[in-house]
């Protein structure tokens, strides 16, 4: 079955000046829904094209189902490819698009007909078999593209931003349909996206990429709850970032980070030294907020500068007493609302604070999405 191994793969363009994939190694397990996630230009689509055989690596090896495929053409790799732009034949109806692969492979007509019907019933479009692509909605066209990719019998499905051209509500519905389909058919899927909500909802595991490199691989919960890299804390979910120094290292894996103007926060963790400059990250939804100024351990005073009602949540923009700005998100059902200009106390739970070495090029550069 099609597990995929990428071993020390590098790909550069412009005579080596642009390194799109930089010494990447990955192991995608059999029957796994795996996503490559990152901002535009991070190398995720290039890596997918390398796995597909559409381009060749400069260095490294790619294995599909235990077979080295560096020199194997795309049509012999046993893959199905789904593009953001659907890539349907505009002059063919839905039926001919879906059964194109079996016909090219010269399968028996009975088998091609059976597969075509099964695939279209699976994506709930058998009744539109005689429609041409321009008569279909975007969601329908993507389901046709998926059926076509599966009709040739591929067990490895490669999806390049498959939901990117669809509107928000259709994306939400189709991503669950897509995962269910992959799991029901026991496929291996590699899904490229820049949408972290899409990746976390649909994936068994995710590789977060930036500037051609894989920063962290893990399931959605691991990446959210335990980011190993500062950019992962930024790109998966949302985080507030504050600068400081380690002012004290205590026993029991505790230390103190001193923020601007000497404001202390106790943090859990290890591996940091007194005097070290660090950046801390904390999720807006992990912060606590109370009315008035009540000095408690791991709390800072602040003033509400902005309030945004977002349905299930309320988003507060707060200026802390040292001038730093943060965001606090609280469930609207708590019915504990705060107004702009109100003085508040913000609690920072020690176990919810992530600490990272301060980036050499600065925080802004390290968190940039380009």
Question: Residue locations for each model-derived region?
Answer:
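ABC ATPase nucleotide-binding domain
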Residues: 5, 27, 63, 345-347
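The feature captures the beta-strand-to-loop junction immediately N-terminal to the Walker
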Residues: 37-39
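Helix-to-loop junction immediately C-terminal to a conserved catalytic motif
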Residues: 52
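Conserved coupling/switch loops of ABC nucleotide-binding domains, chiefly the family-specific signature
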Residues: 58-61, 111, 211, 243
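Conserved ABC transporter NBD signature motif
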Residues: 60-68
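ABC ATPase nucleotide-binding domains
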Residues: 74-80, 84-231
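Non-catalytic connector elements of ABC transporters
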Residues: 239, 249-370
């Amino acid at each position: 079955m099609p597990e995929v191994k990428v071993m020390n793969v590098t790909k550069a363009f412009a005579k080596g000046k642009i390194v799109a994939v930089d010494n990447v190694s990955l192991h995608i397990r059999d029957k796994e829904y795996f996503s490559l996630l990152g901002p535009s230009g991070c190398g995720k689509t290039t890596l997918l094209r390398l796995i597909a055989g559409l381009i060749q690596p400069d260095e490294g090896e790619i294995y599909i189902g235990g077979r080295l495929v560096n020199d194997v053409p795309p049509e012999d790799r046993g893959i199905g490819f789904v593009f953001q732009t659907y890539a349907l034949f505009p002059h063919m109806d839905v039926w001919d698009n879906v059964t194109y692969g079996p016909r090219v492979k010269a399968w028996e007509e009975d088998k091609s007909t059976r597969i075509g019907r099964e695939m279209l019933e699976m994506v709930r479009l058998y009744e539109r078999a005689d429609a041409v692509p321009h008569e279909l909605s975007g969601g329908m066209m993507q389901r046709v593209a998926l059926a076509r990719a599966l009709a040739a019998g591929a067990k490895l499905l490669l999806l390049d931003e498959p939901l990117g051209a669809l509107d928000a509500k259709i994306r939400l519905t189709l991503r669950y349909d897509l995962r269910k389909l992959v799991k029901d058919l026991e496929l291996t899927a590699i899904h490229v996206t820049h949408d972290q909500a899409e990746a976390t909802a649909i994936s068994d595991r995710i590789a977060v990429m930036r500037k051609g490199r894989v920063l962290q691989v893990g399931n959605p919960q691991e990446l959210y709850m335990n980011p190993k890299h500062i950019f992962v804390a930024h790109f998966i979910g949302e985080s507030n970032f504050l600068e400081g120094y380690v002012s004290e290292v205590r026993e029991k894996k505790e230390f103190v980070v001193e923020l601007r103007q000497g404001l202390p926060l106790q943090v859990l963790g290890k591996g940091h030294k007194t005097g070290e400059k660090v950046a801390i990250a904390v999720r807006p939804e992990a912060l606590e907020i109370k009315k008035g100024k009540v000095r408690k351990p791991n709390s800072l005073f602040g003033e509400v500068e902005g309030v945004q009602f977002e349905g299930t949540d309320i988003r507060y923009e707060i200026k802390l007493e040292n001038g730093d700005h943060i965001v606090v998100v609280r469930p609207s059902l708590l019915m504990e609302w705060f107004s702009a200009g109100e003085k508040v106390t913000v609690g920072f739970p020690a176990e919810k604070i992530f600490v990272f070495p301060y980036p050499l090029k600065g925080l802004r550069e390290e968190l940039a999405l380009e």
